[in-house]
Curated annotation (Swiss-Prot):
Gene transcribed to yield this protein: ydiU
Residues where ATP binds: 87, 89-90, 110, 122-123, 173, 180, 259
Taxonomic lineage: Bacteria, Bacillati, Actinomycetota, Actinomycetes, Mycobacteriales
Active site per database record: 249
Catalytic activity line of the entry: L-seryl-[protein] + ATP = 3-O-(5'-adenylyl)-L-seryl-[protein] + diphosphate; L-threonyl-[protein] + ATP = 3-O-(5'-adenylyl)-L-threonyl-[protein] + diphosphate; L-tyrosyl-[protein] + ATP = O-(5'-adenylyl)-L-tyrosyl-[protein] + diphosphate; L-histidyl-[protein] + UTP = N(tele)-(5'-uridylyl)-L-histidyl-[protein] + diphosphate
Protein name per UniProt: Protein nucleotidyltransferase YdiU
Similarity section: Belongs to the SELO family.
Superkingdom of origin organism: Bacteria
HAMAP family: YdiU_SelO
Disulphides: none
Organism: Mycobacterium sp. (strain JLS)
Cross-referenced InterPro entries: SelO (IPR003846)
GO molecular-function terms, A-Z: AMPylase activity; ATP binding; magnesium ion binding
Cofactor: Mg(2+); Mn(2+)
Role of this protein: Nucleotidyltransferase involved in the post-translational modification of proteins. It can catalyze the addition of adenosine monophosphate (AMP) or uridine monophosphate (UMP) to a protein, resulting in modifications known as AMPylation and UMPylation.
Keyword Transferase: yes
Amino acid sequence: MTNLSLDGRFARELPEMAVRWKAEEAPDPRLLVLNDELASGLGLDADWLRSPDGVRLLVGNSVPDGATPVAQAYAGHQFGGFAPRLGDGRALLLGELVDGDGRMRDVHLKGSGHTPFARAGDGLAAVGPMLREYLVSEAMHALGIPTTRSLAVVATGRPVRRESVLDGAVLTRVASSHLRVGSFQYAAVTGDTDLVRRLAEHAIARHHPEVAGAADPYLGLFEAVCSAQAQLIARWMLVGFVHGVMNTDNMTISGETIDYGPCAFMDAYDPETVFSSIDSWGRYAYGNQPSIAAWNLARFAETLLPLFDDDIDRAITLAQNALGAFGRHYEGALTAGMQAKLGLTGVDGPAVAPLLDELLKLLQDNHIDFTSFFRALGLAARGDNEPVRGLFVDLAGFDAWLDSWRALGRDGAAMDRVNPVYTPRNHLVEEALTAAAAGDMEPFETLLDAVTGPFVERPGLQRYAEPAPEAFGRYRTFCGT
């Protein structure tokens, strides 16, 4: 595929935020998984990507003529503490290409080796975490949730030393961009307002061109990002997704989910659900995600204040008013999504709100599996109550709720279109990654097949729809990606 061309727009327009760098040589690259559907959408030949030259591209060891791989600079608040210089410590932006729909897309490597931003790290990644990101990001895409995509995972043949010696790997990731709130924080901390302005103009052109001609395009950018993030967080909440590390460097300007390190899907409904081993205070718990998103957006607004108005007081007022809309956008998206999950899309929101509040309390008090409940409720919409009733200990309380729900009308077929049968359940993810680390990719491939077709129940996949057995115990995740 000799005609492949990768642009270097980010590096060209924002050289202060890009360090030209090369991926470390992979001694024995071996393709583990390739996303044929995504490759086709990008105009890439999947057969060529499987060739030795294609695999070398996927690890960054052979790039097209004219391509300028760079490590991107960004800052960020990590668990509330500000770090002025983070950046791509083990990642590289190979460049941008235009996909079949005319959209510019980043082609990005993760685990490609030490960069100037690596600090004490080795810049490498292991097979398990890279396969994990591939699996979960593609599941999120199948669920209709904006996300970075995964093109491939390649084992490098290089050992990676962690608590033990693991097999190294590189993830080839595709995204609308890798611009983050932390990108703006990095630009702002330099004190160079012109750099912040150029970054904002780059973001507008890339993601929100509709605001370019507005009276205040920079305020328009902020409002657009607030709206996109409100929609995104609501979609997370609707499927029980817990990101786990909502630092400002992990909040995108595009409104896509990024960085799947300690993420997981909630089993039994509980707003205090935390999986990350490093989130000991529950900062990024499931129920805290909307407020954390608003906090992150406030940090974004701080970087844009000089662009909003020369008068700092007026700039702050503009920012506060715009940020205030985040909560309204989020609540609107969440309410509409929950109405769809309950089959009540034609019912007025005020009639649904008390029903939803009561339901969430019942789910929490009875320790009900979040995903299983909504699929079982779809059966109740068709007249089969027993599967969903069988989930509850407090039958009297649930039966009363069920009567109230039935009185509002319901649409079981519509419910099945939005309530997944299959999500990346934590015990199945661990099972698949353990097998893959031992050289057996079949469990990974079967799980991937299930979660990338999440809404249609299929024979032979019953265990992929079931909650974890009690013996699985309390789940903890680690930031391996």
